[in-house]
Amino acid sequence: MAEKEKWGIANIYSSFNNTIITITDITGAETITQWSGGKVVRADRQESSPFAAMEAATRAADDAKEKGIVGLHIKVRAPGGNGPRTPGPGAQAAIRALARAGMRIGKIEDVTPIPHDGTGRPGGKRGRRV
């Protein structure tokens, strides 16, 4: 019988300041590799750029391939909560780079935390007065 293919989960956290890519096994319990935009570029202002996300995703995919992972289910997360609910500029670039690196892509889902009327937004009763 043929050996079963190993799949993993790619957690992509993309804010407007950075992009963090963590690849875990299928249970999500064991981290295989973790890369961020800040690890691959030198300037702080470029951490969130699509180029940094692409570079981080490529390196993460290489690490995962070494461990024998052939496919990934992708979970995209934005800051959420009181922060923005849209992923940063690196999310799409990271997904594309993972696919281009030769990883098979399974499900892509959005796991941004959404408050069910939790705490109030920063700014107070009268908002931010400029």
Curated annotation (Swiss-Prot):
Signal peptide: none annotated. It comes from the Archaea. GO terms for molecular function: rRNA binding; structural constituent of ribosome. Residues 108-130 are annotated as: Disordered. GO terms for biological process: translation. One of its GO terms (cellular component) is ribonucleoprotein complex. InterPro entries: Ribosomal_uS11 (IPR001971), Ribosomal_uS11_archaeal (IPR019961), Ribosomal_uS11_CS (IPR018102), Ribosomal_uS11_sf (IPR036967). Keywords: Ribonucleoprotein, Ribosomal protein, RNA-binding, rRNA-binding. Located on the platform of the 30S subunit. Part of the 30S ribosomal subunit. HAMAP family: Ribosomal_uS11 (MF_01310). Belongs to the universal ribosomal protein uS11 family. This is Small ribosomal subunit protein uS11. It comes from Methanothermobacter thermautotrophicus (strain ATCC 29096 / DSM 1053 / JCM 10044 / NBRC 100330 / Delta H) (Methanobacterium thermoautotrophicum). The lineage of its organism: Archaea, Methanobacteriati, Methanobacteriota, Methanomada group, Methanobacteria.
